[in-house]
């Protein structure tokens, strides 16, 4: 990096985006005969991009999403039944602005959680507030927060986010208090905030999760109103990977022969 009186000033102002690209932009300005205002605009754009990426990283960390499970990394060829055009439409996050829900059902390993996580990342990119947790963990955390006096704050994060992702709905049995908490969350967010739900259970089995027909009917009525239901079929990613690995090993030449 070149030595210039500007460098310590950029460091003092914490303009690391401009600092990191200053040499590159100075060289570009000379080669392309850029006007000073054009050169400065490029540096400002670099700083804005750096801050945008930092905000996204912070929101990812706070949201509970997994950075590596983005839509860009989703293997659509492995799940041919998925309507990619529909997923791309969801990725615009218009459904969040309309306070609509997305319900993803299907067997283990077909990409439900990956899709939900990928859509949540797209929401984060649009500066939307996201809270993502497996259902049983979210409810366990609420129970612990109630005991420690932090329940109002913990509940507020769930209720006030723009997009709530409830992963693995119905995977584990819930206590009566957890069921009540889940119902209240769904009820409070009705037409106020979007929810994405993933579940290994068929939609027809979702009533069983609540162990109370009245609560189940009320909760699912709110959850399914203004909702998009996607039933995903196919073979588990993990099973397919194990089969490919077994085939690959079987085709390897025997070194002892």
Residue ranges and their predicted role:
Residues 9, 25-29, 77, 142-145, ...:
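Alpha-helix C-capping/helix-to-loop hinge sites
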Residues 163:
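Walker B motif beta-strand of ABC-family P-loop ATPases
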């Amino acid at each position: 990096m070149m030595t210039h009186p500007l460098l310590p000033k950029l460091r003092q102002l914490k303009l690391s985006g401009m600092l990191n690209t200053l040499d590159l932009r100075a060289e570009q300005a000379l080669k392309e005969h850029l006007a000073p205002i054009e050169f400065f605009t490029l540096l400002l754009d670099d700083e804005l991009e750096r801050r945008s990426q930092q905000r996204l990283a912070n929101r990812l960390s706070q949201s509970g999403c997994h950075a590596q499970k983005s839509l860009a990394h989703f293997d659509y060829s492995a799940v041919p039944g998925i309507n990619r055009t529909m997923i791309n439409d969801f990725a615009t996050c218009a459904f969040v602005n309309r306070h609509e829900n997305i319900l993803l059902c299907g067997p283990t390993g077909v990409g439900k959680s990956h899709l939900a996580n990928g859509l949540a990342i797209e929401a984060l990119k649009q500066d939307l507030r996201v809270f993502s947790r497996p259902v049983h963990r979210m409810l366990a955390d609420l129970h612990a927060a109630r005991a420690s006096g932090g329940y109002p704050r913990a509940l507020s994060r769930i209720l006030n986010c723009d997009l709530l992702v409830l992963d693995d709905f119905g995977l584990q049995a819930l206590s009566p208090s957890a069921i009540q908490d889940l119902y209240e969350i769904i009820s409070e967010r009705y037409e106020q905030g979007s929810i994405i739900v993933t579940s290994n259970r068929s939609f027809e089995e979702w009533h069983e999760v609540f162990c109370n027909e009245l609560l189940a009917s009320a909760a699912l009525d709110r959850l399914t109103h203004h909702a998009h239901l996607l039933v995903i079929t196919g073979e588990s990613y993990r099973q397919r990977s194990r089969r490919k690995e077994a085939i690959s090993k079987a085709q390897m030449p025997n070194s002892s022969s």
